[in-house]
Amino acid sequence: NKERTFIMVKPDGVQRGLVGKIIERFEQKGFKLVALKFTWASKELLEKHYADLSARPFFPGLVNYMNSGPVVPMVWEGLNVVKTGRQMLGATNPADSLPGTIRGDFCIQVGRNIIHGSDAVESAEKEIALWFNEKELVTWTPAAKDWIYE
């Protein structure tokens, strides 16, 4: 139950007022919020975050889009949170996202897909370390824990 994932509401999700709805979905699922901040990410930070995409033709546009407004990076914890979180987000391209997923319900176009989620435990660890220091990761026990896990 200690697996962690990195989730970030992108500038379009912030501008459209979807932060609360996104947090609500993760809370309702039973995942535990460990860290959250509201920030305007620097291009340098975004280039590190998306380093694996740096050779792709869309990379400069991606960095500019992510730097166009504030973002809400978060860390969530729970059983299989990386895999389940990705399922909750829906496909990267909203056109392929099922209704009921975050992208399926709230967005239309791949270039404005409102949210980022780690694709593996290893990438989650890297992304969490990039965006948060150890003191920002809060250790706590939710009152509902025993109603979520056996």
Curated annotation (Swiss-Prot):
Say if the entry is tagged with keyword Kinase. yes
Q: Which reaction does it catalyse?
A: a 2'-deoxyribonucleoside 5'-diphosphate + ATP = a 2'-deoxyribonucleoside 5'-triphosphate + ADP; a ribonucleoside 5'-diphosphate + ATP = a ribonucleoside 5'-triphosphate + ADP
Q: Which cofactor does it need?
A: Mg(2+)
A single Gene Ontology CC annotation of this entry is:
nuclear microtubule
Gene Ontology biological-process entries:
CTP biosynthetic process; GTP biosynthetic process; UTP biosynthetic process
- SMART domains noted in UniProt: NDK
| Keyword annotations | ATP-binding, Kinase, Magnesium, Metal-binding, Nucleotide metabolism, Nucleotide-binding, Phosphoprotein, Transferase
Catalytic site residues? H116 (pros-phosphohistidine intermediate)
Name the InterPro entries for this protein.
NDK-like_dom, NDK-like_dom_sf, Nucleoside_diP_kinase, Nucleoside_diP_kinase_AS
Molecular function terms from GO: ATP binding; kinase activity; magnesium ion binding; nucleoside diphosphate kinase activity
- The EC designation for this entry is 2.7.4.6
Under the subunit heading, UniProt states: Homohexamer.
Q: In UniProt terms, what function does this protein have?
A: Major role in the synthesis of nucleoside triphosphates other than ATP. The ATP gamma phosphate is transferred to the NDP beta phosphate via a ping-pong mechanism, using a phosphorylated active-site intermediate.
Tell me its family: Belongs to the NDK family.
Name of the protein? Nucleoside diphosphate kinase
